[in-house]
Amino acid sequence: MIFDQEDYKAFDPEIWEAVAKEEERQQHNIELIASENVVSKAVMAAQGSILTNKYAEGYPGRRYYGGTDVVDVIESLAIERAKEIFGAKFANVQPHSGSQANCAAYMALIEPGDTVMGMDLSAGGHLTHGASVSFSGQTYNFVSYSVDPETELLDFDAILKQAKEVQPKLIVAGASAYSHIIDFSKFREIADAVGAKLMVDMAHIAGLVAAGLHPSPVPYADITTTTTHKTLRGPRGGLILTNDEDLAKKINSAIFPGIQGGPLEHVIAAKAVAFKEVLDPAFKVYAQQILDNAQAMAQVFRQHDKFRVISDGTENHLFLVDVTKVVENGKVAQNLLDEVNITLNKNSIPYETLSPFKTSGIRIGTAAIAARGFGVTESIKVAELIIKALENAENEAVLNQVRAEVRELTDAFPLYEGLN
């Protein structure tokens, strides 16, 4: 019977081989994509559990199907742990992704066609903060705010002035490529000054917020959204937080039946496990290592005149580097580094002049290497290897040397043993 196929290597060797290749790639690549991380075996085990069989439309105690007593316990644990981590009164753990979480938050806060202010994509914002190719930009009237052209930092006086001109119903704070502390109290003041709601997307910094290493938006935002992977080091998924009971009801309705059907209870179980890991004191040590590694790497680039670190540094898990004095564009840099087994992404920089398919910059994040065990010494070495590869793009002998040094690092810090 099909149900007896426990060994998928024998049943489906094509998929098994592809997964094995990905395991090999992750083991022998240095992962610097800021939105990626490495989950624990416990998180993977929960996500791969028998819960994948269970349908459970609705919420704990209010399901549309029977046989949900157990998943009610699991989802309730996830909710309570999320509330404890972030000091929120209400939490919805059902969003399948951060984009789904943002979509539901918009539905709870505004109406189609309403004016919204969100961070410009090239300044560090996210597609769901009003990009024209996103549902957000197509459903709502988004007006983008940017950063100061000189400092490349948020200019709250300029944002306030723009808000008074635009009169938005909602202001969205948060970013996917902004490397400094965000003052959410300032955004609250601006929102109040123009009678707007405030939503914060803390997807990238949630783990730092949880560890007390970045100010929390929860006391200031009407709704806070996040992903559960990235710096939270959980499974891929979303989370919505609020302290407002009426908004909590609107959020729940927006998720189900609004934009989703049955929740992924196996993923919610994995979220619950990850949340328990976040509540362990060891997580704060991990989060501090993320910061230390990012700042050490950024400093290496700052000391090389051919590279420019955007906004001159970092206060979180990521930073951007303008590479156009060394290679043609960010895409070239990304592809070259892929060849030496260093994985990162091309990224637009503030007031970008190149297309988003090329970009002037690269984005470097340290959440995954910190999870793997890399410290400051290893992080500095990685930064030096990136520079070495980019400055010697046509020198195969040097690139081979970089590959060898990358392999030494990855062999010294294995991901998982006996996984496949």
UniProtKB/Swiss-Prot annotation:
<feature type="modified residue" description="N6-(pyridoxal phosphate)lysine">
    <location>
        <position position="230"/>
    </location>
</feature>
<dbReference type="InterPro" id="IPR015421">
    <property type="entry name" value="PyrdxlP-dep_Trfase_major"/>
</dbReference>
<protein>
    <recommendedName>
        <fullName>Serine hydroxymethyltransferase</fullName>
        <ecNumber>2.1.2.1</ecNumber>
    </recommendedName>
</protein>
<dbReference type="GO" id="GO:0030170">
    <property type="term" value="F:pyridoxal phosphate binding"/>
</dbReference>
<keyword id="KW-0028">Amino-acid biosynthesis</keyword>
<dbReference type="GO" id="GO:0019264">
    <property type="term" value="P:glycine biosynthetic process from serine"/>
</dbReference>
<comment type="function">
    <text>Catalyzes the reversible interconversion of serine and glycine with tetrahydrofolate (THF) serving as the one-carbon carrier. This reaction serves as the major source of one-carbon groups required for the biosynthesis of purines, thymidylate, methionine, and other important biomolecules. Also exhibits THF-independent aldolase activity toward beta-hydroxyamino acids, producing glycine and aldehydes, via a retro-aldol mechanism.</text>
</comment>
<keyword id="KW-0554">One-carbon metabolism</keyword>
<keyword id="KW-0808">Transferase</keyword>
<feature type="binding site">
    <location>
        <begin position="355"/>
        <end position="357"/>
    </location>
    <ligand>
        <name>(6S)-5,6,7,8-tetrahydrofolate</name>
    </ligand>
</feature>
<comment type="similarity">
    <text>Belongs to the SHMT family.</text>
</comment>
<comment type="pathway">
    <text>Amino-acid biosynthesis; glycine biosynthesis; glycine from L-serine: step 1/1.</text>
</comment>
<dbReference type="InterPro" id="IPR015422">
    <property type="entry name" value="PyrdxlP-dep_Trfase_small"/>
</dbReference>
<dbReference type="InterPro" id="IPR015424">
    <property type="entry name" value="PyrdxlP-dep_Trfase"/>
</dbReference>
<dbReference type="InterPro" id="IPR019798">
    <property type="entry name" value="Ser_HO-MeTrfase_PLP_BS"/>
</dbReference>
<keyword id="KW-0663">Pyridoxal phosphate</keyword>
<comment type="subunit">
    <text>Homodimer.</text>
</comment>
<keyword id="KW-0963">Cytoplasm</keyword>
<comment type="pathway">
    <text>One-carbon metabolism; tetrahydrofolate interconversion.</text>
</comment>
<dbReference type="InterPro" id="IPR049943">
    <property type="entry name" value="Ser_HO-MeTrfase-like"/>
</dbReference>
<dbReference type="GO" id="GO:0004372">
    <property type="term" value="F:glycine hydroxymethyltransferase activity"/>
</dbReference>
<dbReference type="Pfam" id="PF00464">
    <property type="entry name" value="SHMT"/>
</dbReference>
<dbReference type="InterPro" id="IPR039429">
    <property type="entry name" value="SHMT-like_dom"/>
</dbReference>
<dbReference type="GO" id="GO:0035999">
    <property type="term" value="P:tetrahydrofolate interconversion"/>
</dbReference>
<feature type="binding site">
    <location>
        <begin position="125"/>
        <end position="127"/>
    </location>
    <ligand>
        <name>(6S)-5,6,7,8-tetrahydrofolate</name>
    </ligand>
</feature>
<dbReference type="GO" id="GO:0005829">
    <property type="term" value="C:cytosol"/>
</dbReference>
<feature type="binding site">
    <location>
        <position position="121"/>
    </location>
    <ligand>
        <name>(6S)-5,6,7,8-tetrahydrofolate</name>
    </ligand>
</feature>
<dbReference type="InterPro" id="IPR001085">
    <property type="entry name" value="Ser_HO-MeTrfase"/>
</dbReference>
<feature type="site" description="Plays an important role in substrate specificity">
    <location>
        <position position="229"/>
    </location>
</feature>
